[in-house]
């Protein structure tokens, strides 16, 4: 099950929707392998080249980590330079001694995004998740006016559970 959170920019009111987790219809089989009629959904969740790398690893005998509901799905990442939050698909594929996870880059500065802490046991973006590994506060960048704000500054206006 996934959850969504809506925050509004304090300046222009633009809504930012943060969707985390994964719906129950997105089974590991459908995500990582697809079925007779459809290709793997992983193709929709990852940038093309990243998907190609993951698909190659799976075809070569790699195994996705599906040990618990939080081991794959939409997660919070942040840029250590810009201090802004991003939602990206997280998964782990293991083959022999090789462990593969997606590596994303910030669209603003090009730095590698970091998985936000404290997401192991759930997907509710608590205040702890809104802080980077160094404890500094992370922020949301408004896509309309560019204002950068801390989510609790505007308050979560809606919480949505999705499946």
Q: What name fits each language-model region?
A:
Residues 17, 84-88, 111-115, 132, ...:
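Short functional micro-motifs and their immediate structural scaffolds
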Residues 1-7, 17, 163:
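His-enriched metal-coordination microenvironments in redox/metal-binding proteins
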Residues 2, 15-17, 21, 28-30:
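Large eukaryotic, non-enzymatic subunits of multiprotein complexes that serve as scaffolds/tethers
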Residues 72-96:
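Short, structured interface segments
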């Amino acid at each position: 099950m996934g959850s969504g959170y809506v925050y509004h920019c304090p300046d222009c009111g633009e809504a930012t929707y943060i969707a985390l987790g994964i719906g129950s219809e997105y089974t590991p089989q459908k995500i990582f392998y697809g079925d007779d009629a459809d290709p793997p959904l992983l193709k929709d969740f990852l940038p093309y080249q990243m998907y190609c790398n993951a698909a190659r690893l799976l075809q070569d005998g790699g195994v996705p980590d599906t040990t618990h509901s939080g081991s794959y799905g939409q997660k919070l990442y942040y840029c250590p330079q810009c201090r802004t939050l991003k939602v990206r698909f997280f998964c782990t594929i293991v083959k022999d001694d090789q462990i593969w996870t997606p590596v994303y880059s910030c669209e603003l500065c090009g730095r590698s995004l970091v998985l936000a802490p404290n997401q192991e046991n759930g997907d509710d973006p608590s205040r702890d998740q809104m802080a980077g590994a160094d404890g500094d506060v992370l922020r949301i960048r408004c896509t309309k006016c560019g204002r950068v704000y801390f989510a609790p500054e505007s308050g979560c206006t809606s919480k949505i559970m999705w499946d």
